[in-house]
Design a protein with these regions (language model features):
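Conserved alpha-helix/loop element of class I SAM-dependent methyltransferases that forms part
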Residues: 41-60
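Conserved beta-strand/loop positions that form the S-adenosyl-L-methionine
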Residues: 65
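Class I SAM-dependent methyltransferase SAM/SAH-binding core
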Residues: 69-71, 75-106, 110-115
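A conserved beta-strand element that flanks and buttresses the S-adenosyl-L-methionine
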Residues: 126
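A short, conserved alpha-helix within the catalytic core of class I
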Residues: 134-143
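Short glycine-dipeptide loop
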Residues: 147-152
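Conserved class I S-adenosyl-L-methionine
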Residues: 154-181
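Short alpha-helix
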Residues: 200-219
């Protein structure tokens, strides 16, 4: 049973957050079928917000982890001097590489986060529906170390729903998701667009887990629950090594 998947009802790397709630199975199954027929990208929905966060930081050299086919890269290209984009999926990265072939400001690398240039630091690092594919605590620690002094980390992530609060918080999304599908993709389809076919993963960490890990590894990080089963995290590194965060 699925309430939504990242490559279906609203693509972006985040499959079900409530599993096994069979009492609502019939309704959720119908919603899922409808969403699959009218797909739209949650990632694209949040991309303007991400770009705004990066632009506000004044970042010039940007790292996009898990770039997919490059929709966010295209937006970042308008505000950054250089964009380095990592994507581990071979089929997806080919699309991105072809898209930006000949653009000296964009570097597309077929690699996951572990395959980045470990000697390099960036003004801004972005993960859009990617963090839940990675081990939470060590990844946050490494992300912090990827930033130059004063650099900014921007995350739009997925969390595992747990308890009544999460379930109630997700009710508006369950209603809004099919409405957005009809607005953004009114024509019924049988196959997903290419930018919504990247591999998915189930979120393992709850929002409480994420808040606790961020408090430990990214002191001062700002975390907010968002619509469509998402949260956002913004962290500004200290301007000087060993100093306090700019948050």
């Amino acid at each position: 049973m699925t309430t939504r998947v990242d490559a279906g009802p609203g693509g972006g790397g985040c499959p079900d957050i409530f599993d096994g709630r069979e009492n609502a199975g019939v309704l959720l199954s119908r919603l899922d079928r409808f969403n699959q027929r009218h797909p739209w990208s949650h990632n694209d929905h949040y991309s303007p917000w991400v770009v705004g966060q990066v632009a506000a930081s004044g970042a010039r050299d940007v790292l996009d982890i898990g770039c997919g086919t490059g929709n966010l890269v295209a937006r970042l290209r308008d505000i950054a001097t250089t964009v380095t984009a990592l994507e581990p999926d071979a089929a997806t990265v080919r699309v991105a590489a072809q898209r930006f072939a000949g653009d000296p400001a964009v570097t597309i690398v077929e690699a996951d986060f572990a395959g980045r240039d470990h000697q390099r630091r960036w003004d801004a690092v972005i993960l859009l529906a990617v963090l839940h594919h990675l081990p939470l605590v060590p990844t946050l620690r490494e992300l912090r170390d990827c930033l130059v002094p004063g650099g900014r980390l921007v995350v739009v992530g997925c969390y595992r729903g747990a308890g009544l609060v999460d379930m109630l918080a997700d009710l508006p999304a369950m209603v809004a998701n099919p409405v957005m599908g009809m607005i953004k993709h009114p024509a019924r389809v049988d196959t997903l667009p290419p930018h919504m076919t990247a591999p998915t993963a189930e979120p393992k960490d709850t929002l409480a887990d994420i808040r606790a890990a961020a408090a430990l590894e990214l002191p001062g990080a700002r975390i907010r629950r968002r619509l469509f089963w998402r949260y956002t995290l913004v962290y500004d590194a200290p301007s000087e090594p060993g100093g306090d965060s700019a948050n």
